Amino acid sequence: MWMTYQPKKKQRKREHGFRKRMRTLSGRNVIKRRRQKGRKRLTA
């Protein structure tokens, strides 16, 4: 077996970043929930 997590900053931002979240309704709901909860970091 090999390590399945090979971190890449660009890929992480593209998949889970703020702009990607804002594109879809469900993504905006994620941001909204995290704001309500008082998360320090909203996205990756």
From Swiss-Prot:
Segments of skewed composition (Basic residues): 7-20
Gene Ontology MF annotations: structural constituent of ribosome
Residue span of region Disordered: 1-20
Gene3D superfamilies referenced in this protein's UniProt entry, alphabetically: 1.10.287.3980
Gene Ontology biological process terms from the UniProt entry: translation
One GO location term (cellular component): ribosome
InterPro entries given in the database record: Ribosomal_bL34 (IPR000271)
Family matches, as PANTHER family: LARGE RIBOSOMAL SUBUNIT PROTEIN BL34M, MITOCHONDRIAL RIBOSOMAL PROTEIN 34 FAMILY MEMBER
Name of this protein: Large ribosomal subunit protein bL34
Species of origin: Clostridium kluyveri (strain ATCC 8527 / DSM 555 / NBRC 12016 / NCIMB 10680 / K1)
GN (gene name): rpmH
